[in-house]
Regions:
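Short coil/turn segments
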Residues: 2, 18-20, 55
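NAD(P)-dependent Rossmann-like dehydrogenase/reductase catalytic/cofactor-binding core
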Residues: 84-87, 91-150
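Rossmann-fold dehydrogenase core element
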Residues: 1-4, 29
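Internal alpha-helical scaffold of NAD(P)-dependent oxidoreductase catalytic cores
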Residues: 12-49, 60-99, 143
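A short glycine-threonine-serine/GTX helix/turn-capping micro-motif
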Residues: 48-59, 107
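Short, electropositive, low-hydrophobicity segments enriched in small/polar residues
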Residues: 59-61, 118-119
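Short, charged, surface-exposed secondary-structure boundary motifs
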Residues: 7-11
Length: 150
């Protein structure tokens, strides 16, 4: 699977090593850890799940980022400001998530009762955006399994 976040030292590399001895596994992990986090997986099925979630994950963020970009542009902001605002929004939000990994708590601190954010989130939930995203991820998983089985 592609791993573009490796260029930013924010990657995980997932592996299965059934046929190597412990010494070789240790050497391999030490080498990979020079440029990425390393995580051993139990089987190919787990690798396929991680391909759908982690390997394709940057595309999900970029896709959502593009939606926000287009919203800025549609509201009349220029392209230069739009890119600046959207990139800062994504980076800042990423840092907030690192500090408070519980999404529910973080969302409560952002969305005031009866406010603009609550209205937007209500619309997203009403349109079952979460179900659409989960369906897309399941499709990626199915495709990963299909590729493996070829």
């Amino acid at each position: 699977m592609t791993n573009l976040t490796i260029s930013k030292n924010k990657a995980f590399l997932f592996y299965i090593m059934k046929y190597l001895n412990k010494k070789d596994i240790k050497k391999t992990e030490e080498f990979i850890s020079l440029f990425a986090n390393v995580k051993k997986c139990k089987d190919e099925k787990q690798i396929d799940m991680l391909t759908a979630l982690y390997g394709s994950g940057p595309a999900y963020y970029v896709f959502f980022n593009e939606i926000i970009n287009n919203a800025f542009l549609n509201m009349g902001f220029n392209k230069k400001d739009t890119i600046l605002y959207t990139n800062n929004l994504m980076l800042g939000t990423s840092k907030l998530i690192q500090e408070e990994p519980k999404a529910e708590k973080l969302l409560r601190s952002i969305a005031s009762k009866g406010g603009t954010t609550e209205a937007a989130l209500t619309q997203l939930k009403k349109n079952r955006v979460d179900a659409l995203i989960n369906k897309a991820i399941k499709q990626a998983y199915k495709k990963s399994r299909k590729i493996l089985l070829k």
